Amino acid sequence: MSIISTKYLLQDAQANGYAVPAFNIHNAETIQAILEVCSEMRSPVILAGTPGTFKHIALEEIYALCSAYSTTYNMPLALHLDHHESLDDIRRKVHAGVRSAMIDGSHFPFAENVKLVKSVVDFCHSQDCSVEAELGRLGGVEDDMSVDAESAFLTDPQEAKRFVELTGVDSLAVAIGTAHGLYSKTPKIDFQRLAEIREVVDVPLVLHGASDVPDEFVRRTIELGVTKVNVATELKIAFAGAVKAWFAENPQGNDPRYYMRVGMDAMKEVVRNKINVCGSANRISA
């Protein structure tokens, strides 16, 4: 088994009406927890790392871990560069073996976003690396990125069509009412906008900010064409909450093998639920 491009996973998902979950990773324990569940449920998976993650643990170390687990669990997986903003950074990481990258130029005007994305696409496609980009802008906070509500805006369907045609991007993250982080109230998802985007864009669509979104809402977006669902905040909250509870019950505890496993097990329940919501279980052979 090996680290593969997300395009192979997303093409199958698009053809068969399900979504591939993309779980953000932060260390060896989060990688292990996610893959334990994906192996058990035989679900394809995308492991997503932000620039902040690769500051915490080197890409080369994460890549080695993922390669080893891919062999151990006999399953292909994609290691994905999430919310990267620099061609130079992406180039270095692709040369290190990564075959999936998101270039985030959503903070730029349309023309500048197109120019940046096209430069990344030209390089990545020469390396058999798939490229995701974002049009429209999600609000909220994730990792080192913060976007206030005034700066967020939804994806225009006709602009999305032009954007894909001009850049040759492999998948498109759309802004339809979700946000990074948790919600103070139930989000208002613009399903009609998503349907209109799907009508004019044929590449796989990506839902960012899926943490804390009601399961039925996520399922509806998949019915309307979403083939990659990003989850980050819910994983961290589950892990941290379980570890905090363990220390509350074991104030003298100090063995990482115990409290890390408690956090991992809590995270695994979130992963299990998201796989069920995405409909991705039993999509890879045993």
From Swiss-Prot:
Needed cofactors: Zn(2+)
Cofactor info, note text: Binds 1 zinc ion per subunit.
Binding site for Zn(2+): 83, 180, 208
Record-listed dihydroxyacetone phosphate binding positions: 181, 209-211, 230-233
Swiss-Prot/TrEMBL keywords: Lyase, Metal-binding, Zinc
Keyword Transmembrane helix assigned: no
A Pfam family that the UniProt record links to this protein: F_bP_aldolase
CDD domains in alphabetical order: FTBP_aldolase_II
Active site: 82
Cystine residue pairs: none
GO biological process: carbohydrate metabolic process; D-tagatose 6-phosphate catabolic process; protein homotetramerization
Stated role: Catalytic subunit of the tagatose-1,6-bisphosphate aldolase KbaYZ, which catalyzes the reversible aldol condensation of dihydroxyacetone phosphate (DHAP or glycerone-phosphate) with glyceraldehyde 3-phosphate (G3P) to produce tagatose 1,6-bisphosphate (TBP). Requires KbaZ subunit for full activity and stability.
Subunit composition and interactions: Homotetramer. Forms a complex with KbaZ.
Protein name per Swiss-Prot or TrEMBL: D-tagatose-1,6-bisphosphate aldolase subunit KbaY
